Amino acid sequence: MRPIKLNLTNFGPFLNETIDFNNVENNQLFLISGKTGSGKTMIFDAIVFALFGEASTKDRKESDLRSHFAESKKPMVVEFEFKLRNQYFKIQRQGAFIKEGNKNKTLGQLAVYQYEQDDYALRESKINSGNQFIKALLGVNAEQFRQLFILPQGEFKRFLLSKSVEKQDILRTLFNSQRFEEIQKKLSDDVKEVREQIEKRYNDLENHWKELETFDDETLCEHKVISARQTNNIIKVLPDFKMKAQIIRDDFEQKKEILKNKVNSTENALNNNIKLEDALNKLNENQQKYEALLVNENEIQEKVKRVTEINEVRPITNLLEVKENTISKKGKVAQSIEEKSKSIFDLEDKIKQSNLEADNLKEKQDDIEELRRFIEQTQLFFEKANKYKDAYNNYQFTKTAFTDLEAHLTQKNEEIKDTTAKLNQRQPDYRKIEQITEAIYNLNNDIKQLKQNEKDKIEYDALEKRKMQKQRNLKDLSQKRVQLNEEYNNIDKSKLDLNNKQDVIATVQAALHTGETCPICGNEIHTLSSHVDFDEIMERHQQLTLLEEKIATVKGDIIKCESELSHIEEQLSKYTIASLENINYEALEDEVEKKYQEKKKIDEENNEIEKLKDQLQQYEKSSHDLQMNIQKKEHILKENETAINDFENTTGYKRVDEFLTKFEDAYNQIRQFDQTLNEIEQKIQNYKSTLAIEKNSVTYLKNNLAEIETEINETDMKINEEMQRIGFTSIEQVEKVTAQASEKQNLEKEIETFKKEKQSYELYIAQLKAETNNKKLDDTQQLKERFEEMQQVYETASTELSQHDYKMEFNSKKITEINKIIDELNSELQSQQEVFQLAEILAGKNEQKLTLENYVLIYYLERILTQANQRLAIMTGQRYQLTRRAQISQGYSGLEIDVFDAHSNQSRHITSLSGGETFQASLALALGLSEIVQQESGGISLDSMFVDEGFGTLDQETLETALDTLLSLKSTGRMVGIISHVSELKQRIPLILEVTTEQYQSTTHFKKQ
């Protein structure tokens, strides 16, 4: 990704600023320079905010990015154009903020555009989908982008020197290695769960095995001694439990069947005898009851006759009851007519009185209407009474505050005038500072060179002295070598090959005899005596060996001396006589001191000007704030005056409390009047409605009374006709028979009961005679005792069989469970063995004692170090390489970094590096980490990079090393920006993005040197 253009609106110190990165040519290094606090880092905050809605550091929130001097109703907006893989994109992101006068926050906005067909086309317009689009486009999240795009070297120095645990936190964030820890934890949890499950199965198996019933069988009891964990042996003996149980059950079943037949036979005999005895007893009892019932038969016949007479007189009785009810109804209707007539008279009198009350009340109608108009006109003022109270109360206070603010504004304007006069249009002369700094830099370089010449002169003289000494040593060694060669050549070298052959010759002599053929030469042996002096040969051999060693030593010394002379000559060739003689630097040091004094004087003047400008800026801001407050107070005064005038003109009152009292009194009078009038009118209406109802009721009752009299006459006629039909001559006869009507129901019930009992006895006696005919009765007690005895024996046998069946069923379930558990155990143990081993390895139980996550982090760290060493080797002349310290310990080990020194051919602690060397190692590590993160995040190509480092803390030598290192970054093919305010960097970097602060805002511009 390569930045093209960045537009900032109300962002940090930039109110309306555009940075065009097209001013930076391809692969060009440029410097971002400016005073402390001018907003250099805010440029990268803006880029990260545009892409991810966050700042370039975690410590800053989105609300901290908005300019404090932005207009309250204008948003903070960042527009960022960039190039990615030969395509152009533009992002517009607006931050959330609260407009002046609003309580709710105005939400942020996001728009993502892609350049197509000579114009930008909208791709996303919603924040969530837009963020996902950008993340997918870049292939990295905000944290990874910070590591790739901005390299804060101080952070990487801490990363370089940190312990394994600290590196682990950083690397796991960048490479999302928590997933490996989760995999390890998930696997460990699964293994733990499986092991717990297996142990639970063994416990269940042991419980089932212990609970298995042995039926007191000796063989089964011996089987139960087997341990529950010997699953193979248990499987072998389980069939014995089933077989033994079935044999015992067959015996119990046979015994029970025999006893069952005996019990059934005894029970049948007992039941038949009991039935016969009961039938005979019931036959005798029912015959006695039947004879007693027949004694009352004549009395029942008399009651039948009386019921017949009562049934004939029933119609006349009904007619008499109807007549009596009708006469009673007639009396009630006459009484109701009298009551209704009295109620009508009372209602007419009440209506007259209510009309008089209404007329008296309406005489006050005009006064009430006047009050009603007052209420309507002043209703709004009553509802907002607090507003007008506040207007009266605040008017004088606001007027006093307004006068005070005007006085303060006059005073502040005088201060602005005085400060402007002191400033006298002066501006800080930073250009002069840069020129002096450049001159000091050049003078220091010259002094450094002269001092180096002085050191070189000393080293040159030492080398010349050392050269002469080595030449003398070489001459002496050459003479010694000639002397040793002469001694070596003078020694007799004949028969030296027989040295160490004395034992062999003696062995051959012992095996041969005079006159035999020699096995070596084939001639006849004449004598076996020794004719070789082995001691003399050994002495000469030792002398030659000693001389050879001395010659080799002298030769090695000559080669070493010649090599050292060659090295000295090579070192001497680096020096020039002219530079060695130029070592006078005292005058230049005096000149540097003068330049420092001149720079100090200009710095003091610049600081004074900056202080006056800052003071003027504060005065102007205070003046602006006072003007805004005066306008606000003036607006409040006008609002209060308008409110007071409206109140007094409309209500006629100058005190709000008096108006409120008047308004509430008028309102209560109107409400009381309306309520009383409504009550009277409603009462009149109710009286009239009731009166109409009562008159209708009287008319209805009179008609009903006439109908009742007609009904009484018709009933009398029907009674006379019915008496003539029956033969009664007087009402007394009818009443006498009617008096007996209450007995009718009881008489009929007695008659019906007699008939049913008689018929029931006759049927039951006939049935019992049929059952007992020709049957013999035995002793029931003896039969019962025999049955109970057989029943008890049978129940005992049944209980024994049931108990055995239960035990068999219990054993069957247990055996099924045991087989199931053993099958599951065998399956789990076979399938989980490799998983158990894998879990232990991933948890750190391995040769390296590393967890899975730390193993992965070591892999990433080694890749980072490999990438970093490619640059570090170039930076340090192939001297240093970063290496991972190999060690074995439980936990997060193996992430410490050592440095390998090629000069000493061994590794040493990273803290042993000098400041400049540490800077080079940190920078190489930062670049290596950046490139590996790119590879892991999908191979995104970031064509630009920014290095943010406090170069002002470095000494001169380390700064030179840093500059050389940073200048070499152009070869990586990236646009590289360096953030710093160190003046020396301006002399080495030709393109500068200058960030200038003016009062409360900053501006930027590119300049070339």
Swiss-Prot record:
Secretion signal, residue range per the UniProt entry: none
Record keywords, A-Z: ATP-binding, Coiled coil, DNA recombination, DNA replication, Endonuclease, Exonuclease, Hydrolase, Nuclease, Nucleotide-binding
InterPro entries for the chain: P-loop_NTPase, Rad50/SbcC_AAA, SbcCD_Nuclease_C
Segments traversing the membrane: none
BP GO annotations: DNA recombination; DNA replication; double-strand break repair
Keyword Transit peptide part of the UniProt annotation: no
Gene Ontology molecular function terms on file: ATP binding; ATP hydrolysis activity; endonuclease activity; exonuclease activity
Superkingdom, natural source: Bacteria
Pfam family, one: AAA_23
Sections of the chain in a coiled coil: 178-214, 243-309, 337-503, 578-842
Binding site for ATP: 34-41
Family the entry assigns: Belongs to the SMC family. SbcC subfamily.
Subunit: Heterodimer of SbcC and SbcD.
Protein name per UniProt: Nuclease SbcCD subunit C
Organism per entry: Staphylococcus saprophyticus subsp. saprophyticus (strain ATCC 15305 / DSM 20229 / NCIMB 8711 / NCTC 7292 / S-41)
Lineage: Bacteria, Bacillati, Bacillota, Bacilli, Bacillales
